[in-house]
């Protein structure tokens, strides 16, 4: 079995969705078993925040990781890109409190990763997790679950009153072959951009959120349709929800072999499921055909 890290460092600068502040991110290769973690290089002592479920401190409209009073928010797109492209170990240096939104998708991160390439890292005694019984979390009619399955698959459904979105479903599988999985993620999931509803934007801005949001980095939908077409996919919104789910579940460290099924879910429910998977323990089932 193998892990992977970057063959060279990556640097990106951009504005945060909620803070509206420009930050710089440097992603550096790291040793086998180090995992993915953030370093706040703008603060004394360079505090480290691991990209783990236990570090989640906030889940309203994005996923935030924290350690004490130090935090990094809106981590999900970057973490989805790293995990979807097979980067297990990475030091993510950031000079502010929010990861740049870039174009609202994970495409820029994915292109950067593909450009520098990966380095294989042999691993001994790594035992992956297989889900052997259904694990559910729900709130009202929204839910997310992990079901026993022969492969790692993500399926998502959304439903909005706006005709341009309506009811959408999409399903995507993560093959055990790294090259095929990365290509599939880059083509089918990474390009899907974050989206918002026109009638909610003013309220969110009044509450101090989406200060960095614009028609250049987020799709906006109103009663008459999309304000900034064209879409990259007819079902781009639900594909973006899979992107968010991949990013949130990457906090497990590696994806269990399971079918992750979600409907009208949220970052909060995603993280609740991840925690529940951890609560089951990593010894209730084993598998030997996991790609990480």
From Swiss-Prot:
State the superkingdom. Answer: Bacteria
What cofactor does this one take?
A: Zn(2+)
Give yes or no: UniProt keyword Ligase.
Answer: no
- Pfam families per the UniProt record, alphabetical: LpxC
Question: What is a single cellular component term in the Gene Ontology annotation?
Answer: membrane
Which GO terms of the molecular function aspect are on file? metal ion binding; UDP-3-O-acyl-N-acetylglucosamine deacetylase activity
Q: Which SUPFAM superfamilies match?
A: Ribosomal protein S5 domain 2-like
| Active-site residue list | 267
User: Any idea which UniProt keywords this protein has?
Assistant: Hydrolase, Lipid A biosynthesis, Lipid biosynthesis, Lipid metabolism, Metal-binding, Zinc
Q: Which residues form a coiled coil?
A: none
Ligand binding (Zn(2+)): 77, 240, 244
InterPro entries in the record, alphabetically? Ribosomal_Su5_D2-typ_SF (IPR020568), UDP-acyl_GlcNac_deAcase (IPR004463), UDP-acyl_GlcNac_deAcase_C (IPR011334), UDP-acyl_N-AcGlcN_deAcase_N (IPR015870)
Q: In which pathway does it act?
A: Glycolipid biosynthesis; lipid IV(A) biosynthesis; lipid IV(A) from (3R)-3-hydroxytetradecanoyl-[acyl-carrier-protein] and UDP-N-acetyl-alpha-D-glucosamine: step 2/6
EC number(s) per entry = 3.5.1.108
Asked if the Swiss-Prot or TrEMBL record annotates the protein with the keyword Metal-binding, the reply is yes
* Record field: catalytic activity: a UDP-3-O-[(3R)-3-hydroxyacyl]-N-acetyl-alpha-D-glucosamine + H2O = a UDP-3-O-[(3R)-3-hydroxyacyl]-alpha-D-glucosamine + acetate
Any one of the GO BP annotations: lipid A biosynthetic process
- Which family is this sequence assigned to? Belongs to the LpxC family.
Q: Could you tell me what this protein does?
A: Catalyzes the hydrolysis of UDP-3-O-myristoyl-N-acetylglucosamine to form UDP-3-O-myristoylglucosamine and acetate, the committed step in lipid A biosynthesis.
NCBIfam families named in the record:
lpxC
Q: What is this protein called?
A: UDP-3-O-acyl-N-acetylglucosamine deacetylase
| Native organism | Nostoc punctiforme (strain ATCC 29133 / PCC 73102)
